[in-house]
Amino acid sequence: MNSNVLALAVLPNGDLVAGGNFTTAGGQVSAYIARYATPCPATVAITGAACASSGGANTYTARSLPWTGSTYRTRGTGLPSFAFVAVVNGFSATSIPLAAVLPPSPVGCAVLASPDVVDVAISNAGTVDAQLALPNTPSLAGIVLHQQLVALEVDGNLNFVQNTSTNALVATIGTF
């Protein structure tokens, strides 16, 4: 840019918009406004089916996009009101009946992400928030993460009642 940038904004898709006193940006004519789009955008897609729990429809969603140098945040809802929750992160997709690995589990529940890294959380009123700090390392760009929550529901005496799973997320790490 051939002059001052006075304002910056990030669009919902991650593009950067700059406004200022410049008339060129990146060697191109650009009167006072420029848009920078990354060749490697961060994306998140929902895949697979969840199975219902005592808390309702288990749902796993992204609350932010996985950009290098940021904290990628996700949230599970509709989980049992009290459960130990495995936060499953993997580098490949799977499709294993949950009952084959963690009985008792209802028919239709499946493990949809390879358990390469597993963290444990406790549901709070049927909700679990998870986060993953992504270093500002461009070599992470394009790496695909498969993620899912598996809830191990317990009763008041901490006896296991049933195990259920959410849909999966497929997150591609992006960078500028």
Show the residue positions of the predicted features:
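Residue-level hotspots within well-ordered secondary structure
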Residues: 39-176
